[in-house]
């Protein structure tokens, strides 16, 4: 049975995925599908490290700037639109290149994870857990997951309410443990997954510099927009890069304190990304910071894969 080949480029935040993808795409006749859960939103660009207008012109991108943060958008929507993008790219005779850092979304696209049925049932389940979170807080929500599925809970930080909500939602929709999803998956595509990583200190230094660069590019203004619209339920409220500035806007903390908090949150997020990638996906790892030939090495891996 024919299985569509795709290339996936993953790695922690700030490692250089976009840069490498833009180098590789013309050489392998590829178009890029964003595998980032936040780049789909039109209103937030700096904090989501969205490709620039020039980069978007260089190579055709999919799942970037297609929704408003006030729209409902779930992993099921991402998979549906991602599959459509893969088909469109393949129909042209081009190679789909998925690039991003949202491990669960990428995994759900590459593999047939059981995500439950669409429709009102999905919405009502999400609302139920969201209400529980609002009434009891992130720690209690995580404890609830720990009771239902301790294996899944161990892989999620108690303060990461977004992932806890997702796990509880999947359990409710499917009637199966979130941690058992991996045992029930089958591949949707024949995927070569290339991962970028380097030693932790270098990755963390890049993250810190990247936050400074984002601040210079106008991140604070973008965060203020998110803060000013917090009364309307939207997707960016809990996103790293925005919520860290809320205490500054409310007068509780200094700007420097919030910038440092963002750097810390970004470093922790990078660590969680790597943990997910290493446990959930089969990856060919390359080091873009130590290896000057990383582009050539990635290209060789891709050519070998495509010629199989």
From Swiss-Prot:
Annotated Gene3D superfamilies: 1.10.20.140, P-loop containing nucleotide triphosphate hydrolases
Record's signal peptide: none
Function: Catalyzes the transfer of a dimethylallyl group onto the adenine at position 37 in tRNAs that read codons beginning with uridine, leading to the formation of N6-(dimethylallyl)adenosine (i(6)A).
Annotated segments matching region Interaction with substrate tRNA: 36-39
The organism of origin for this protein: Lactobacillus gasseri (strain ATCC 33323 / DSM 20243 / BCRC 14619 / CIP 102991 / JCM 1131 / KCTC 3163 / NCIMB 11718 / NCTC 13722 / AM63)
Listed InterPro entries: Dimethylallyltransferase, Guanylate_kin-like_dom, IPT, P-loop_NTPase
Annotated residues for binding of ATP: 11-18
One term of GO molecular function: ATP binding
Subunit structure: Monomer.
EC identifiers of the protein: 2.5.1.75
Cofactor(s) it depends on: Mg(2+)
Highest taxon, organism lineage: Bacteria
GO biological process: tRNA modification
Site entry: Interaction with substrate tRNA: 102
Catalytic reactions on record: adenosine(37) in tRNA + dimethylallyl diphosphate = N(6)-dimethylallyladenosine(37) in tRNA + diphosphate
Residues involved in substrate binding: 13-18
Name of this protein: tRNA dimethylallyltransferase
């Amino acid at each position: 049975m024919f299985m569509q080949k795709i290339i996936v480029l993953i790695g922690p935040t700030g490692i250089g995925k976009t840069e490498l993808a833009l180098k590789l795409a013309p050489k392998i006749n590829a178009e890029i599908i964003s595998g980032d859960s936040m780049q789909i939103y039109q209103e937030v660009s700096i904090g989501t490290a969205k490709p620039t207008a020039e980069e978007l012109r260089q190579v055709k991108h999919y799942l970037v700037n297609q929704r408003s943060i006030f729209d409902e958008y779930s992993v099921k929507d991402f998979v549906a639109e991602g599959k459509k993008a893969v088909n469109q790219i393949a129909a042209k005779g081009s190679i789909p290149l998925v690039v991003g850092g949202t491990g669960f979304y990428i995994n759900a696209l590459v593999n047939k994870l059981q995500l439950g049925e669409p429709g009102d049932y999905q919405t009502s389940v999400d609302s139920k857990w969201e209400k529980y979170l609002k009434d009891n807080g992130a720690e209690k929500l995580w404890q609830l997951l720990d009771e239902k599925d301790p294996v899944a809970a161990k892989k999620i930080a108690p303060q990461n309410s977004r992932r806890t909500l997702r796990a509880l939602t999947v359990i409710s929709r499917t009637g199966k443990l979130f941690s058992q999803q991996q045992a029930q998956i089958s591949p949707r595509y024949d995927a070569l997954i290339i991962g970028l990583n380097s030693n932790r200190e270098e990755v963390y230094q890049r993250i810190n510099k990247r936050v400074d660069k984002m601040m210079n590019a106008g991140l604070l203004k973008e965060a203020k927009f998110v803060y000013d619209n917090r009364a309307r339920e939207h997707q960016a409220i809990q996103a790293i890069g925005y919520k860290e500035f809320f205490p500054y806007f409310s007068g509780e903390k200094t700007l420097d304190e919030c910038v440092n908090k963002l750097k810390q949150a970004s470093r922790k997020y990078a660590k969680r990304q790597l943990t997910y990638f290493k446990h959930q996906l089969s990856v060919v790892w390359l080091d873009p910071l130590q290896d000057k030939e990383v582009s050539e090495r990635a290209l060789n891996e891709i050519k070998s894969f495509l010629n199989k």
